[in-house]
Amino acid sequence: MRWAIVRFPGANCDEDARFALEKAGIRAEFVWHTERDLRGFDGVFLPGGFSYGDYLRAGALAAKSPVMEAVRRFAEEGRYVVGVCNGFQILTEAGLLPGALLANLNLHFTCKEVGVRVERNDLPFTRLYPRGQVLRLPIAHGEGRYYADPETLARLEGEGLVVFRYAPLKDEADYNPNGSLHDIAGIVSEKGNVLGMMPHPERAVDEVLGNTDGLPFFLGLVKEVAR
């Protein structure tokens, strides 16, 4: 299995993504943002960071990069695309996922571990998690507040497109770290092949880091190929 990790200027989670994919047994290769051909890959990973310095809006300039036309074709063919943090922002700016990621309600960059509940486990990314499991995953963003108009929110909820939702790790009342509507932490496309999420599963794949809750996310992709 071979995945492309797109490198945008300013991205800084590409090595984390490579480590996580390879730990799951997936061959990972870096692809520069000027690339226009993604043939031969089984999946595409858009990593976190600050592409183009987050100028204009987070992900706005990266969404216009040459590689995104190839990513769009890739997604239209039903192949897997994952965007984490800045990658999620890029997917919404490119129109590959609905909604937008706005500035955190507290107007601060937030970096900590949060509770993330698995809402669906019928996708390659989540099939190794029990539905309803609350994961402990890191976040690190200043613009992670998911927003969509009421009609879009109703469609996301009605069609089961919310995959991850912020949830309490213990009994904390302020478990939503950024003010995301409906506590949304991650969504998927109607085809189920394009996933965007703000928490970082790739930063929670090794005991050395004190947390492996993110590893099944990547192992599930391998299981999908084996089916």
UniProtKB/Swiss-Prot annotation:
Keywords: ATP-binding, Cytoplasm, Glutamine amidotransferase, Hydrolase, Ligase, Nucleotide-binding, Purine biosynthesis. This is Phosphoribosylformylglycinamidine synthase subunit PurQ. The keyword Heme does not apply. GO terms for molecular function: ATP binding; glutaminase activity; phosphoribosylformylglycinamidine synthase activity. GO terms for cellular component: cytoplasm. The active site is at C85 (nucleophile), H200, E202. Part of the FGAM synthase complex composed of 1 PurL, 1 PurQ and 2 PurS subunits. NCBIfam families: FGAM_synth_I (TIGR01737), PRK03619.1 (NF002957). Pathway: Purine metabolism; IMP biosynthesis via de novo pathway; 5-amino-1-(5-phospho-D-ribosyl)imidazole from N(2)-formyl-N(1)-(5-phospho-D-ribosyl)glycinamide: step 1/2. It is found in: Cytoplasm. GO terms for biological process: 'de novo' IMP biosynthetic process. Residues 2-227 form the Glutamine amidotransferase type-1 domain. It catalyses: N(2)-formyl-N(1)-(5-phospho-beta-D-ribosyl)glycinamide + L-glutamine + ATP + H2O = 2-formamido-N(1)-(5-O-phospho-beta-D-ribosyl)acetamidine + L-glutamate + ADP + phosphate + H(+); L-glutamine + H2O = L-glutamate + NH4(+). It comes from the Bacteria. Part of the phosphoribosylformylglycinamidine synthase complex involved in the purines biosynthetic pathway. Catalyzes the ATP-dependent conversion of formylglycinamide ribonucleotide (FGAR) and glutamine to yield formylglycinamidine ribonucleotide (FGAM) and glutamate. The FGAM synthase complex is composed of three subunits. PurQ produces an ammonia molecule by converting glutamine to glutamate. PurL transfers the ammonia molecule to FGAR to form FGAM in an ATP-dependent manner. Its EC number is 6.3.5.3, 3.5.1.2.
